[in-house]
Amino acid sequence: MSRFYRQGSSSESSSESSSDSDVQVKKPTRYVSSSEDEIEEKRIVLSAKDKIWQQFDESLKKVRNALKTNDWVSTTSEFDNMTKLITNGKTTRIIEKEGFPPSFIKALFIIQTSHRDLTTEQKKKLHANNNKSYNSIKQKLKKTCDLYAKELKPYHDNPALVNEQENKANSDDDDDDLSESESEESESSDDDKGKGKGKAAFGKKPATKAVVAKKPLTKKGDDDSESESEESESESEELISESWSSDSDDDSDSDSDDDSGDNKWMIKDDKKVVAKASVTTVRKTDKDKLDRRNAVVSPLSGSGSAVPTAGEGEGEKLTQDQIMKKVKEVISNRGKLKTDPMKQIQQLEYFYSLIQGDKETFIVLYELIAAQFDTASVKVALSIPVWQKVADGIKKLLEILETNTNFVLVLEHQEPTISKGQVAVTGNLLALFEMLDDEFSKSLQSINYPTKEYLDRLQDEQIILDLGESLQKYYESAGNNGAAAKIAIRRIEHIYYKSSNLKNNIIPSTMPLSEQITLMSKLSSFVYKFGDERLNARTILCNIYFNAINNKFHEARDMMLMSHLQDNPTLMDVSTQILFNRAMVQLGLCAFRCGYIQEAQNCVVEFSGLRKDLLAQGLSVQSKTAEKDTVREVEETTRILPAHMWIPIDLIETVNLISGMLIAVPQNAYRPFDNKFKTCKFYQRHMDSVDRQIFIAPSETSKDIIYQASKALSAGDWQQCLEHVNTLRFWSLIPDIDSVREKLTRIVQEVSLKTFLFTYSTSYDSILLSELADRFHLPKSQVHSIVAKMMNNHEISASMEHSTESITFRAEQTKLQYLALHYSESLVDFVEQNERIYDVKFGTSYRKKGDNDHLPIAGGQHHGHQHHGHQHHGHHHHNQQQQQHHQQQQQTTQHHHHHHQNQNQGNQQYQNKKHHNSNQQKSHKKRQNNSLVVNN
């Protein structure tokens, strides 16, 4: 074509554009063109008001969708966004001119009514996060609704206004769309009449393509269809865009030749079509998306009336093979990085509603259950509705297997060995059952205890028990006894801790004790026969626990000793170690209830204090300086048992302290200075810490009360001791209180009698048995038995007088007396040794000379003895002569001779006195060793 014609066409188009300035027409380009490029859409510039109003409209839609599924987490999020947006400065200025946005008021009204009308049953089904959001929005919603009470009043008076306005708007839009599509079809039909036989001279296919996918007429009030279809918009948009892009490419290629030549002469008519198409596109931007989704029905829509198609543009229904092919595609994407589990669940649920045939139904349902488990995580459990769906799904799988006896269940990586007529189906119902059980325990961990919600959730335990019984029967009939044994131990673990006797059990066993014993025996025998070593150990521990809570101490103790599990508990896995600890603690509590104090103390001694982690009732205590191990913390958190299975730590500590008191008090009275006999270290540490205090406060805690009881018991006041013990709070956790108190009273009386004899036996020569019986309120025969046993064990030195029914105590020295005597003997030996050393070093003559200076002292010590009177007089006369000699320095020979005679007599007197004292001490020591009578 010549350049002249092209210039003419451009001038013509410019003149047209000046007359119609609202529509911009793009020049047709050759070789690079597409149907979508030729449809020019107007870019609408929204005002600030329209933008804000549009945000509120979107929030209203999200709120509606969230409330349909009781998703209060999303509702709270949208509510917070709207309240922030409504208080924005720009929004406030617009509201002053235009008023409040209707969508905001509608959203407030919808949230308020939904929050108010939520039933109790619906509240029970909310999971933890959802329930938290439901409670948190209550106060915020009340404050906000009070601020906008005037605007909310019309909707309260007539709630139908919320839907009427939207239905009216939707119907108007549908009428406009219908009229526009009809006008476009009429125009396109007029253009088709003016075409040549093989070419489209005037009309453009892209203009008609934009309205090919018509939206069918909908009824008023059908606004929910848009929100439901939006859930699957992201998936179906890709499918639709591919089909549209392929169609547009084909059309652009086929029409590329038609854009030359004659098209340039008919540019005026062409512009009208383009202009009309652009206007239609601008007004139907959102509607076209929904129309295109309706043009090709997606299997994700989930609508019962929708007809699935085999291809993007084909109208054929999906066959069973095609459905299974799509199911495999969904399964292949499971677990990938950007895969949404919720969307996969929606897809599988839709395919499950379409599938036919038992085998295909089993496969789709099994994969659906596996996908539902993917919604849980390590810390977050399955929501209660999903958990119940999974339980129902497992029941349906089991029904399919029981109905079709020719179906053989095989594992995924197992080669099936089937005979003629049998059908192999892949699945592992045991794994599904174990995961369902674990999710149930995890769900209980996330609920506060004890609350009504916890009790309601705990009622679902019966679902697991019934399902486990059915699965065990199926595996037994299938010959898979190993899997049946694993299910049996799961059933045992839901039964062994229940007893109608336990007060701290939140749900006592509704089954009679005889039936419960029979069931435990039956399941245990099956596990012993077909289970492995680990399952057998767990079964034994569960039976020990079960016998202990039913006060069968001897059976539980014998089972523990015969199994030898206490020899190497560290070789077990962690969960089995926890079960072993629980069995030991419960065995100790049983021994305490039965009156076996020593056995009770031996069992619970290692579990007092902050050792909750040993019983899976809390996290382990770490030092403040230690680094936080998140991996270990997560592992311990997952191992924590549900709260209704816990053994109260206060009960364990109180039993340990009382047992320690009844053991340690008589031991301390018998051997007060021997630390090796202090076996109850936990009790002794507490007593020592209180004794070190300067001021002891009144008793408030259990430990303080037991301290006061110990002091009373040490003094032999058993009545005061019992008064303190009876005020403890642990009695509310003890079943059969009267029987336990009676046994404990008898034990306290016996211990008080022993302590009294150990402490005050040295103060009595003899005592009557009747007096002891009256003092401690014990039968005379029992007192006789206790005293005889103490004498037989050489704990007291006494003899029994049967004629007078009295006890005669033999004198025995106390520890203090023994130490004093030993000290005196050491002093005597020390003096004698010093004298021998003195004689060796200085000689006897020097010591005699030294004694002369001290003779007056030696003589003075025995002044008053008659047979030494003359010697004393001579010695005194010697002192006078010696003084005169020093004063006058004159001495006669006769007096000098008399002086030496008196000196020799004085030395002889000192030696005799020393020998007399030594003999007296030795004889006194001998008398004390033979018999020492102490009178206090």
UniProtKB/Swiss-Prot annotation:
InterPro entries: EIF3C (IPR027516), EIF3C_N_dom (IPR008905), PCI_dom (IPR000717), WH_DNA-bd_sf (IPR036390). GO terms for biological process: formation of cytoplasmic translation initiation complex; translational initiation. Pfam families: eIF-3c_N (PF05470), PCI (PF01399). Residues 9-22, 199-215, 880-893, 902-911 have a biased composition (Low complexity). GO terms for cellular component: eukaryotic 43S preinitiation complex; eukaryotic 48S preinitiation complex; eukaryotic translation initiation factor 3 complex. Residues 283-294 have a biased composition (Basic and acidic residues). Residues 1-38, 156-265, 283-317, 845-936 are annotated as: Disordered. The keyword Cytoplasm applies. Residues 643-814 form the PCI domain. Component of the eukaryotic translation initiation factor 3 (eIF-3) complex. This is Eukaryotic translation initiation factor 3 subunit C. It comes from Dictyostelium discoideum. The lineage of its organism: Eukaryota, Amoebozoa, Evosea, Eumycetozoa, Dictyostelia.
